[in-house]
Amino acid sequence: MNGSNGDSADGHRPASSSAAPARGRAGRVRMTGKQRREQLLDIGRSVFAERGYDGTSVEEIAERAGVSKPVVYEHFGGKEGLYAVVVDREMQLLLDMVTGALTGGHSRELLEQAAFALMDYIDTSTDGFKILVRDSPVAQATGTFASLISDIATQVEDILGLEFKARGFDARLAPMYSQMLVGMVALTGQWWLEVRKPQKAEVAAHLVNLAWHGLEGMERHPKLVGDRQN
């Protein structure tokens, strides 16, 4: 079901029932269906980030929400459905943050905007990023972190294409270079998530430093130094 109903039929026993566990459910607050759905999404997001998909159970999500398991099934059909919605939301949030940051300006400014937006997402939506970078069977159906990075790279591709043309490089190579740049930022973000230093703005500045000055020193027809042609 889509969770449009309230909690009157959510599978709870009356508060006076001796069979109802005291922990988590004693002070349950009544919510509308929409409020309960959002609560379950928030809790599910936190638990999935903490334990991963396989380590998360419907029982724990229900326990933390102070509801019975049937409530989770009513709103999402089960753990897989809840996880899919969480992943979809996080993917859209990250994509919106990056594309929304590209407000125009010089190519370097656009590169800075994209790099900082990704670092900002990692900083402000840490649980979401942890979920996205983990592999799970469900993520394969709803979209993977790799596919999301590819979507972001498509945005960067337009920036590089213009820059390549201005510098006399083959603009057809822009898609490959955009994958390289975005992949570099994403992997650096995963590293920064663990160490949390230096500050995100400084990390973004170093990323842009490497990327931008690397572009400045590019050769039009690069070749390997060694004899590795195949």
Question: Residues of each region from the PLM?
Answer:
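N-terminal intrinsically disordered/low-complexity leader segments
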Residues: 1-35, 171, 219-230
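Hydrophobic alpha-helical segments that form the core
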Residues: 2-6, 13, 170-191, 202-214
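Generic hydrophobic, amphipathic alpha-helix propensity
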Residues: 36-44, 61, 86-90, 94-98, ...
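Helix-turn-helix
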Residues: 39, 43, 47-81, 85
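Short coil/turn segments at alpha/beta junctions that flank glycine-rich nucleotide-binding fingerprints
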Residues: 50-54, 125, 167
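Hydrophobic alpha-helical connector segments
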Residues: 85, 99-124, 178-181, 204
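Amphipathic alpha-helical packing segments from all-alpha helical-bundle domains
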Residues: 92-95, 141-165, 175-180, 202-205, ...
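Amphipathic alpha-helical segments used for helix-helix packing
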Residues: 121-143, 157-161, 187-194
